[in-house]
Regions:
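Enzymes that bind and transform nitrogen-containing heteroaromatic metabolites
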Residues: 1-178
Length: 178
C-alpha cells in the first residue's frame, strides 16, 4: 500500500445504484434514517484529516444551511470554478500529485466523495477502502455512483451490517498490485 494514497470513500446509494436524483436532490436519503443512528459516520469523520470533493458534490453541499465539514480541510476538484467558499480550497491538477502533496503535508486519511471523483480516484488506483450504505429505495433514475472506470478494482468485503431502517452497509478493501 502506498502511503501517499487517499484512503477512504464513504457514500450512500439507492438499491439501484444512484447517489442523487437527476437534479442532484438528496431528499431520499431520509428513508435511511431512524432515530439518532448515524451508521458510523461520526466515527468515520473523526478518523479523517481532509476531504476531496468534486465540483458537483461541492455545489450540492454549498447549498446546505450549515457547512457540514467544519474543522476539516476540504479540497474541491474543478477546472471550471474560479473560487470556492473560504472553508475550502480549489485544486486542478493530477490526482497523484495531490495525493503526494497531502501526504507530505501530514494529511494521511482522506475522504474522497462524489460519483465522478470516486470513479477518477479508483481509476488512478488511489482508493483503499469503500463504505457503501445502501438505502432501501429504488429511485429508477439519477446520478450513478460509478462512472466508466478504465481499470478493474478487485474488492474484498470486510464487513456488512444491516439496520432496522432497511439500510445495509458494506465495507470493502480495494486490492492493489503495488
Amino acid at each position: 500500500m502506498r502511503e501517499e494514497r487517499p484512503t477512504k470513500d464513504y457514500i450512500a446509494m439507492s438499491i439501484d445504484g444512484y447517489i442523487a436524483r437527476k437534479d442532484g436532490g438528496l431528499d431520499w436519503l431520509e428513508y435511511g434514517h431512524t432515530g439518532d443512528e448515524d451508521y458510523g459516520f461520526k466515527k468515520f469523520m473523526n478518523g479523517i484529516d481532509a476531504l476531496i470533493l468534486g465540483r458537483n458534490t461541492y455545489e450540492v453541499v454549498s447549498g446546505f444551511d450549515k457547512w457540514p465539514y467544519g474543522g476539516k480541510r476540504v479540497i474541491i476538484l474543478s477546472y471550471t470554478l474560479n473560487k470556492v467558499r473560504k472553508e475550502a480550497e480549489l485544486f486542478c491538477g493530477q490526482l497523484h500529485d495531490l495525493a503526494s502533496t497531502l501526504f507530505h503535508e501530514g494529511i494521511k486519511h482522506v475522504w474522497v466523495d462524489g460519483g465522478i471523483t470516486v470513479s477518477k480516484f479508483l481509476e488512478a488506483g488511489l482508493v483503499d477502502d469503500i463504505t457503501i450504505s445502501i438505502i432501501a429505495v429504488v429511485l429508477g433514475s439519477g446520478i450513478p455512483l460509478f462512472r466508466t472506470i478504465n481499470r478493474e478494482n478487485q474488492c474484498r468485503l470486510t464487513s456488512t451490517q444491516s439496520y432496522p431502517s432497511g439500510l445495509v452497509q458494506l465495507k470493502y478493501q480495494i486490492a492493489h498490485d503495488d
